[in-house]
Amino acid sequence: MRPRDGFVGTVGDTPLIKLRRASEETGCTILGKAEFLNPGGSVKDRAALYIIKDAEERGRLRPGGVIVEGTAGNTGIGLALVGNARGYRTVIVMPETQSQEKKDMLRLCGVDLRLVPAVPYANPMHYARYSGVLAEEIAASEPNGAIWANQFDNLANRRGHYETTGPEIWEQTDGKVDGFTCSVGTGGTLSGVGIALKERNPKVQIYLSDCMGSGIYNWYAHHEWKPEGNSITEGIGNNHETANLAGFASVDAPLQARENVGVVAARGRMLSSVRPGCGTMTARAASSPATTLPAP
């Protein structure tokens, strides 16, 4: 393996790993993109790097400046690590209900962490909305400026996956990929990878994996925002259309995974949480006409 160019050079280029149990049960080859091998431990490192690079290229982020974002955790970790490497400070707004491990990790990365109540998006104190207001307040007094990363509506998020994740999957499979699925929060991974793969082969099937408590499944299936049930999964699901999802019409089928099924899938040693567990269960169901995975 060749040496990487500094810390940010370690982001991306993650391997594909065959998920043996899921492959055996379906008779298909199901591969997982090992995004946990990114330095921040998640796929969100890619979005963080591209959001920061985009702000630098536009002249909106200067040395010593501040990055502000509202996040359930992983994007904040990525922004903090990349920001540290490039000389920026990071302020993160997070719902107080998120896991203690994420809070501890963010503080370990030197983040100025602001916790807010977990409220619906319509509430001005919703973590994503409040972070935008906070960014404006900090920018007014910060001599080196401050940016709002705005991962939900910043198309640099999608571009990061269009330029890296999608092409990596294509190259690592020698173009022999039949379908792709992932869970959705901002929509950057699904849309970026989906566009990249469809450009290379329009027959590649794109499946949207949504958790209970989110309205994205019903939006794509029935064109209405109608969440069902409750969610315990952190960082995925949504009840409004983000800019990264807007206009993305390449979803061949939306699928809905119940979280108790995701918990079962997450017991595999490579899967670290319910979130990738839901994605694995969706991959198992992709060849089935059913759109809701039954409880075990």
Predicted regions and their residues:
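PLP-dependent amino-acid enzyme catalytic core
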Residues: M1-P296
